Amino acid sequence: MKKLLWIGMLIVSLGARAQFDAAFTNTWALQSYYNPAAAGLDSKLNVVGAYSLQMVGYEGAPKTMVFNADMPLFFIGPKHGVGAAFLNDAIGAFSNKKIQLQYAFHKKFLGGRMSIGVRPALLMVGFNGSEIDLREPNDPAFATSDVKGNAFDLDVGLRYTYKQLWYAGVSAVHLLGPTVKLGDDKLHEVTVEPTFYVQGGYNLALRHPRYKLAMDAMLRSDITNWRGDINARLLYDGEKHKLYGGLMYSPTISVGLLLGFDFHGINIGYSYEVYTGGVGVINGTHEILIGYHHDLDVFKKGKNLHKSVRLL
């Protein structure tokens, strides 16, 4: 028998302040999603999609999908990058969507590249009140019908990348703290708190030239709550394909396993995240990652090696 978990009702009532952002395991592959300054950072068209099915076995548990693409604008100059993303997040009776465009400017600095990015977005929040059986049907905290609304949002980011060796960045999303008013009567609302991200990563070359150790870390906080994520992947760089396997750890929250491969610019990955708070091993999070990267630098000589700072 399925366990019941009305996350949307138990955690957030309409009129409360909600933490909007979903947590993905493969943060290393979604760098421009978390920080707009990473858009068009290398000479690639980067397309990635991730689907996360969290807390398997619980009804109403989060199901999140994100699609993100970015590229440099070579006809203007490699200093400019653009991107777009779409997020669809379902949590119990709530549905959250976000459509965003992003622009980044890159400048050579101290042997690396300093980047600054901005991302305007449209937030769309819905609440399926008709699907909820309330003990007190007249509770003003909840809508009893299906309601939805939208609001303008804005994200900004700053990042420094040193060759393909290491990077560090900070970003602020929901910078304006938008409030989404739901329904025609606007009686209910959801306020999205600003959230801040700090990211960093380092690629360590091993003795064998075909192996590398990629380490990434991210800390996110909306001032009230915080979450840290650390992952390490062992990469095998073959002549025609790449393989990786690794581990992730989020203090006080979860541990997980990462697996994947890259073949001619196509990356497919899988991760399983187990919660350490007593949820149960079989009630973890499955995440599927599918990506594609292709060299766009028409002035570069030689073969397309499909190398990307996101995958190394």
Please tell me what each predicted stretch does.
Residues 4-13:
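Sec-dependent N-terminal signal peptides
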Residues 19-312:
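Subset of outer-membrane beta-barrel
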